[in-house]
Structure formats: structure tokens, C-alpha cells
Amino acid sequence: VPAPDTWPDAHAALSALKVAEDRYSYIEPAATYDAFFYEGRSLGFGITYQVEADALALRLVQPLSPAHAAGLRRGDRIVAIEGRPLADILAADALAEAFGPTEAGAALEFDVRNDDGLRRVRIARDWYDLSYVIGPGVHDVGGRRVGYVNFYSFGRLGLTPWQTALDRLLAQGAQDLVVDLRENGGGLVAIAAQVGSAL
């Protein structure tokens, strides 16, 4: 393995060290990492998506994000970016390039399809406050009261909204609890341990 100082930058070093199957290693500036995990803020559009053959299916839209303010919701599909069809972007392996610069104010036009049809919306990246707990509620399932909560991140500020949601679900008569961690990217082990100990 070449010495670290033989690469022009950290991104080049990571690219050289990664194997093709590695989808998880990445480099992030310390400022955005600290903002996300310690300050409860993020910079971006505020979407989590699944890549399909010709679209990005939105799995989660942060409630206080630019994307949510522009009307995007879970289940919507982005079918074009800046007028370029997603199928073409994906075929060229150019998704990261299509999303462009990551700084605040960088804007893109998205063609978004949902049950209401197709529309074009322009969204600028910006800082927004994270919602750690999304969509808590109690549902009647098989004669039991089942609480549901989507817990987004084990960030430092996530414990209070988690406890508030848990108290609310119990007050509404929840007998069972579903904790949705599908979009949870991890975080601080101490927070995860405290969340787990509450169950």
C-alpha cells in the first residue's frame, strides 16, 4: 500500500483503498458531521431515496427540510434532474455528478411524479433542523394497540424527542411498539444504548 502522502487528497486515497463492493466508506467534512450528530442540523435537500431503474423513489423526506417545503413527500419519484431523465443519468453512472455541488444555495430542478401526476420543482440545498422522530402514532392491529415510530438517527439531540414520542404513545394506550430504523444511519453508541434500554 502506498504511503498516505502519495495521494493528492483524501478522496483519492479512499478511492484507491476501497474495493468495488464497498458501498459504505465515504469522506465527510468534520463541520457537516458534527452538525448532524451533535447539533441536530443537516445541509442538503432532506431526502432519502432508493434507486430504481428510471427514478429515485423517496423513502423519507425530513419534515423541516427544503424538499418538504417544496412539497416532496415519501413515495414521490424523481424521474429527471435538470431535465435529464434519471434512466440516462443512471445508465451513465452519473448520479453524484447530477446532484452537483453540495454547498448551501446550490439549486436543482427535479421532475417529480406521484399519484397527482408530474411536476417540476426547483429546490435549493440549505441547512435545516433534523426531525429525529417521524410519524409517531398508534394503530389497531389484530385487536391490539400498536405504536409506531420512525427513529431517524442516534444523534446527541435525539434522546429527548424519542422519550417524548414514547410517552405519547404509551399515553395513547400502545401495547406493542414498532421502532422503524430503516432510514437510521447510526450515530452515537451511547444514545443507541439509551434508546434500547427504554424498550
Where are these regions (language model features)?
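Flexible, low-complexity junctional segments that flank or bridge functional domains
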Residues: 1-177, 183-185, 190-198
